[in-house]
Structure formats: C-alpha cells, structure tokens
Amino acid sequence: MAGEFGKFIDDKRRGRAAGGGDILLKDIATAMGITATYLSDIVKGRRNPPEMTMLNKIAEVLHLSSQETKELYDLAGRERNEAAPDLPDYLMDKEIPHVRAALRRASEKKLGDDFWKKVFDEIDKEGKD
C-alpha cells in the first residue's frame, strides 16, 4: 500500500509532462537509472524511498518547486524513519553543537509545534537566506 511518499509522487507527476499529460513512472525511473518496476515498488511502499541523489532526480523530472522538494525530503525521511535527508549535515555540524542540544532539550521538555513556530519566526528574523 502506498504511503505518503508514494502518493506525493503520484500526485505530482499528474499533468506535469509537456502538453499537460502525466509524467510516466518509466521516465522518472530512467532519469534515476533504475527500473520502472523498482520505482513502482518505492511508490507503492514496498521499498524505502531512495537516498538524496535519487530524490533530487525525482524533483528535477517532476519539476518540483523548492518547497515541494523539501516536502519530498520530509516524506522520504518520515517513511524511512530518519531525519529528512537534507538535514543531517547541518544537524551534525560540529561547529554548531547547540542545534543538537536544543533538539534534545525540546524533546525532553516535550515542546510541541507552537514552540517550534516561535523558533521558526525568530530564525526568519535573524537568519540569512
């Protein structure tokens, strides 16, 4: 049964081909260098979502926006029960240990989405694009 990741790919490939048709799984698979059967197994939830390089190829073939690509990463990570694949390098950067400490502290205190929304807003005020 397809999970959220597979449903996302299925939804995003509809109507995105030149002329408004659907992008075929075999075309996505070819760009990824895998068989259509293997990709079909991923989309149907019989195999885990692929790693970052392959996710980027999916995003490219489907003409995903930056926001849609981030959603693709999140869904892949969630389905693999891992952090989204674009995050580990930043999370593990030894120059910024407070990232891990803050996440652990927030987890211990069971801080929810309301807290992280405030953090997100602060990052938008302070951060660099």
Predicted segment positions?
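Short, charged amphipathic recognition helices of the HTH superfamily
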Residues: 18-26, 51-55, 86
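DNA major-groove recognition helix of helix-turn-helix/homeodomain DNA-binding modules
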Residues: 53-70
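Short alpha-helical DNA-recognition segment
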Residues: 18-41
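Residues in the recognition helix of alpha-helical DNA-binding motifs
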Residues: 12, 42, 72
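Interfacial/linker helices and their anchor residues that mediate assembly or domain coupling
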Residues: 77-129
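Amphipathic alpha-helical "recognition" segments
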Residues: 36, 51-52, 69-89
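Recognition helix of helix-turn-helix/homeodomain-like DNA-binding domains
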Residues: 33-49, 57, 75
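A short, Lys/Arg-rich alpha-helix, primarily the initiator
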Residues: 1-24, 107, 111, 116-122, ...
